[in-house]
């Protein structure tokens, strides 16, 4: 069996690639640079994870148009990344408009070209509270798009094993599978030392703390 894994180099996508391999899939890893401010570190992390998995392929692609669009603190350096605030009612400014539809479209093209059986994307329970393109309904709808838009006789499963899990659940699973978390990167803001205050850092640190563990990546003091 073959699977395309969207691999950002973060905690969720890296763990998910290990899960896919554990399920018996041969991994074809796809890393997409959409202009995010930590891309250099993310690419380094994704490359290390793909190597540790002995992936069949690791393909990095550039999607520069997201940077041209702006509207997100991840792609526009003029917008400060939001500090995590669990009481913030509005969409966080780290939302990249309709990003996952773009990523999944490219992953579908790649999967169909490789006769792959599945695509894995690491959306999880905390994501779809803040990001509309991580909602279960969106994933279900995109599965229909894939079924309708690929060649007759083609079926590629869009798999989201983490959609009902918390970051702590994911970390626990990854530790069981031996994911090298020291090679992953989650921070939205920094590439040398994680900021510790963005939403991604917050949930990562919380997961390690809930399991009584120290996060192996460096953080600002």
From Swiss-Prot:
It is an enzyme of class 6 (ligase). Signal peptide: none annotated. Zn(2+) binds at residues 187, 195, 198, 201. Its cofactor is Zn(2+). Its EC number is 6.3.4.20. The keyword S-adenosyl-L-methionine does not apply. SUPFAM superfamilies: Adenine nucleotide alpha hydrolases-like. It catalyses: 7-carboxy-7-deazaguanine + NH4(+) + ATP = 7-cyano-7-deazaguanine + ADP + phosphate + H2O + H(+). Pathway: Purine metabolism; 7-cyano-7-deazaguanine biosynthesis. It holds the Pfam family QueC. ATP binds at residues 7-17. Binds 1 zinc ion per subunit. The keyword GTP-binding does not apply. GO terms for molecular function: ATP binding; ligase activity, forming carbon-nitrogen bonds; zinc ion binding. InterPro entries: QueC, Rossmann-like_a/b/a_fold. Keywords: ATP-binding, Ligase, Metal-binding, Nucleotide-binding, Zinc. Belongs to the QueC family. Catalyzes the ATP-dependent conversion of 7-carboxy-7-deazaguanine (CDG) to 7-cyano-7-deazaguanine (preQ(0)). This is 7-cyano-7-deazaguanine synthase. The gene is queC.
């Amino acid at each position: 069996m073959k699977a395309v894994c969207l691999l950002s180099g973060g905690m969720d996508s890296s763990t998910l690639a290990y899960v896919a391999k554990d399920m018996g899939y041969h991994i074809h890893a796809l890393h997409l640079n959409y202009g995010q401010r930590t891309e250099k570190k993310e690419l380094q992390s994704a490359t290390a994870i793909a190597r540790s998995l002995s992936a069949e392929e690791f393909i990095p692609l550039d999607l520069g148009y997201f940077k041209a669009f702006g509207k997100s603190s991840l792609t526009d350096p003029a917008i400060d990344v939001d500090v995590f605030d669990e009481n913030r009612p509005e969409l966080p400014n780290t939302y990249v408009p309709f990003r996952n539809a773009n990523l999944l479209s490219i992953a579908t093209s790649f999967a169909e070209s490789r006769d792959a059986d599945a695509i894995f994307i690491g959306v999880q329970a905390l994501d779809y509270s803040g990001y509309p393109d991580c909602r279960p309904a969106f994933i279900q709808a995109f599965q229909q798009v894939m079924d309708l838009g690929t060649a007759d006789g083609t079926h590629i499963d869009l798999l989201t094993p983490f959609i009902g899990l918390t970051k702590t659940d994911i970390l626990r699973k990854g530790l069981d599978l031996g994911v090298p978390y020291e090679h992953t990167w989650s921070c939205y803001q920094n590439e040398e030392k994680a900021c510790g205050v963005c939403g991604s850092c917050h949930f990562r640190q919380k997961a390690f703390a809930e399991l009584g563990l120290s996060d192996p990546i460096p953080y600002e003091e």
